[in-house]
């Protein structure tokens, strides 16, 4: 069974009244290469930026190795008036009955016949689902009591995390940007060294050794003394990938790494990423490169209008799309 290292539950991001991400849930397993595809404006880049807290999510839970590093439920963002809240409360009451009934069915079957070992994981999952519904903040307020509702809205907790904690998360979930985010006046080697000495407090010699190792792995060993502004776009992206690797992250987040490149440079970067995928490092890649998604990723997620519309293995997504929206997207992309 694969180890889930990043768990995303009901992640939402609002900019004012604009809902950019709407209840995104996704499990990321160790060694996954996940391609996030979808039209421009579907929330893909915002999703990545929320994962390592470059953007503060509005609500949801983000857990790394089962330990939440972001967890908040904001009633005031979801239920703009009392009537909406009452509807939500009624919905969760029904969900509570449904999950409780499901749990009872599995437990009774197991009591009757303990040889049915396959029921154990079902019971465990049913308990988890029941507790999740029961502990939802919506269920903790009596919806007949308007005063209690108003008080709860005022007492909605705000998200609190220190910069030190954010920096720690970013050493595990490192971002590679489409715009490179390199220091133009530094040389290639120093860009990779600086990331380590500032973030991980490694000594210079150790950082230099690690930088040379990863620059060699992306075929940039002959340009280590070049200034960043002397490189092509493809070479800059390779340096950005090497810099990310120097931090020794468990997950690398790629935000459209080839979109700012000339066509002839795209293959240069994609080949480095393909080679990287064979090492077993976990990657989440926002991309418009359908061949990469089809041939390198082991999971493809299609997003549209802030939702995950479909997800699955590449063959499942590309050869047997279930929704008309994905079919239309693939038809346009294939032209």
Language model features with spans:
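Catalytic Walker B motif of ABC-type/P-loop ATPase nucleotide-binding domains
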Residues: 252-255
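Conserved ABC ATPase signature
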Residues: 227-231, 235
